[in-house]
From Swiss-Prot:
Coiled coil: none annotated. This is Putative phosphoenolpyruvate synthase regulatory protein. Bifunctional serine/threonine kinase and phosphorylase involved in the regulation of the phosphoenolpyruvate synthase (PEPS) by catalyzing its phosphorylation/dephosphorylation. Keywords: Kinase, Nucleotide-binding, Serine/threonine-protein kinase, Transferase. It comes from the Bacteria. HAMAP family: PSRP. Belongs to the pyruvate, phosphate/water dikinase regulatory protein family. PSRP subfamily. ADP binds at residues 150-157. It catalyses: [pyruvate, water dikinase] + ADP = [pyruvate, water dikinase]-phosphate + AMP + H(+); [pyruvate, water dikinase]-phosphate + phosphate + H(+) = [pyruvate, water dikinase] + diphosphate. PANTHER family: PYRUVATE, PHOSPHATE DIKINASE REGULATORY PROTEIN 1, CHLOROPLASTIC. GO terms for molecular function: ADP binding; ATP binding; phosphotransferase activity, phosphate group as acceptor; protein serine/threonine kinase activity. It is an enzyme of class 2 (transferase).
């Protein structure tokens, strides 16, 4: 039976999930997880405590409990359960208070809540990335923080959205299609913003697999076409001196991190 895991918070539980996933990913086993956000009252906390205790009774093993609870009364209820507690906030806040010489002022929903200017900036970035996805329009390229380039299905859209959602970066993206291959060049709107261009590439065999699942046995998905497009686009990157990374076998988080590392774009944390 897979070990049971609870991610609990009086907010969104995103912090608890991220912390827990980072720790548990070090172990080569599967976990059965349950996320419980917005545990904002003692009544809710007692119900969660019962769930944890029932899990212990059913499995005979203490479940792992990762939590980021601001309210100390609610936190104490979770402490009193039969779970193995991993308290993200208290583990680090107390030593930091001593080091900084000031007392923390916990505020509910501060980490991932709606925070006026910063929240609006993130929403603006997300809207921008959606409106400027896949070359839908070239009107707003001058306002982009970064413009991702690449062949179809190489990871442009998820990378753009991740950059906007996670870091508040206005990321547009532009595709090069099979019709472009005979005379591959940058459109004028991209030439004007050459300093913002960043290329994505991918192994042709992997691209072939992805496209086959979308349009099987078509010219678009053929290995020959995939090899041609990747070769032509990579040659253009080198010719135009556009930095690029290979997305093959990399998660969207890894791709975004590589992009930020190469470009030096500022991360807007929320």
């Amino acid at each position: 039976m897979a070990p049971r895991v609870f991610y609990i918070s009086d907010g969104t539980a995103i912090t608890a999930e991220v912390f827990g996933h980072a720790v548990l990913s070090q172990f080569p086993i599967e976990f059965e997880a349950l996320t419980i956000p917005f545990v904002e009252t003692l009544v809710k906390a007692e119900k969660v405590k019962l769930q944890i205790n029932d899990c212990f009774i059913t499995t005979g093993e203490r479940p792992l409990v990762f939590h980021s609870i601001v309210n100390p009364d609610i936190r104490n209820v979770i402490y009193s359960s039969e779970g193995m507690d991993y308290d993200f906030l208290n583990t680090f806040v107390a030593p930091l208070e001593q080091h900084l010489g000031i007392q923390a002022c916990p505020v509910l929903h501060r980490t991932h809540g709606k925070g006026n200017h910063s929240y609006e900036a993130r929403i603006d970035a997300i809207n921008f990335s959606m409106e400027n996805d896949d070359g839908q329009t070239m009107k707003h390229m001058d306002k982009a923080d970064i413009i991702l380039l690449g062949v179809s299905r190489c990871g442009k859209t998820p990378s753009s959205l991740y950059l906007s959602m996670q870091f508040g970066i206005k990321a547009a993206n532009y595709p090069f299609t099979e019709d472009d291959m005979d005379n591959l060049k940058l459109p004028d709107a991209l030439k004007r913003n050459k300093n913002k261009l960043f290329g994505l590439t991918i192994d042709p065999n992997r691209l072939h697999e992805i496209r086959q699942s979308r349009m099987e046995n078509s010219r678009y998905s053929s290995l020959r076409q995939c090899r041609l497009e990747v070769k032509e686009v990579e040659m253009m990157y080198k010719r135009e001196r556009i930095p690029f990374v290979d997305t093959t076998n990399h998660s969207v988080e890894e791709i975004a991190t590589k992009i930020l590392d190469v470009t030096g774009l500022a991360r807007h944390m929320f």
